[in-house]
Amino acid sequence: MGISLADSIYSTEKPLSQMRIAITAIDLEQAEHRGIAYVSKGLISSLSDLGAEVYLLTRFDGHRLNPLMKRSMSKQSVREVDCADILDQFCDPSNRIKKIKKKKLHDFDEDLINKLTNKLILFKNKSQIIIDLLFSVFRFYMKRGIFTGRLIHLSNFENTPYFGQERVDYLSKISGFVSIRNIYNLSNLRSKRFLFKSPTIDLRQLNLDLLITTCPLSIEVRTNSRSSGICLQLIHDDIPLSFSKHPDHPFAFYNRLKDAMKTKNCFISKASQEKICYLLEKSCSNVEKNIIYPLPSLNLNKLELASKVKSLRGINKKYILFNSSVLPRKNLSFLINIFQSSQISDKGFDLCVAGKIHDDKYGLDIKRMCESDSRIKLLDYVDETEKAWLFLNAHAFASPSCVEGFGIPVLDAASLGVPVLASDLPSHREIANLVKENRNFRLLDLSNVDKWINEFNQLSTLDLCMEDE
């Protein structure tokens, strides 16, 4: 059995009180927080609870002050401004969204002037990307691929204007930021083999002991340790290699995995470890020691708050819950077909879909499948309190994913004792073994449609069965 991050919750000791640890924030910088972001939040919380000083390695930096302004201000004032800029970028991804919208303006019928204006905007955006890329490469070679970054302390986060924002609730657990501009772009360039070596982060001047990457990266470190450098890479899955529609290019992702395997590494499931070792033709040594199971994503405070909420978004029937960003590999179309083919809706049940629906072909197909079916509730994005309420009140949870590195929503449901219907994947089997006390955990073969329909029909009798027990 692997190690669970939940072990830290019950620890009264502080064995990491002398350690200063940097954690990559690449997933927390994204506009949409997905599974890896929740793993990162759990890791931050666990390390902090065990006494470590935690710093986020970020590509964000201060942008309101130019060098001349900084020279005329005190160091503390500059750090205060830069820290506020970094916090704002973590809190508000709207700038990124606005740029995307600008790029889409040319899709609409417009007059000639507007079309020309949009073409100029697109040209400017693309030119800026190219200029930034060239500048990053130039800077990389000027520094010989070695970066120190700036250590920016975050003190009294509770007294900042950003405290209380759900998106950054993890910031109360960190001590500050390590800001290295374009560090993840450089790592990406190395994974595509456009750079002759991986960017190296020198942790010695920052007095940091360890770097943990929350996903495989082409990156190296230098520390005060006698070893060549302490970097622990957390590896989730092989999905970009096994699923063609994944946005990551398989060559770049393969190289990221290859580079990560050269350092110390851990996996979030035994299934992921075995598959990745097989693909990279590596032997799986220390199988049990190299697995760290994630925490459930449901926050205890949010669960307590949600338990006091009587109703949500007009939901007034029993429902089956699906919780995930709507992506092809999550197989929501399969679940909708099962729901519509079963008799459970005739017995007063709805299907609630909680997760962002993207403006792509798959998202549009899902909307078309549901547009004439009032029994299917497409809730789109839900906040953490809403998500907690949906799990607390769900009659059952369903996850028909085609491929998963782990499956945190399945863990969330099973941990609360919610009946689970999940695709029979190796990672889902591991979750079933972790929550053996949940006797209503069903693993179903995706090729057996009749079995899925039958299990859906049986859900309506679940309450009666539980009462008999």
What name fits each language-model region?
Residues G2-E469:
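Carbohydrate transferase catalytic cores enriched for Leloir-type hexosyltransferases
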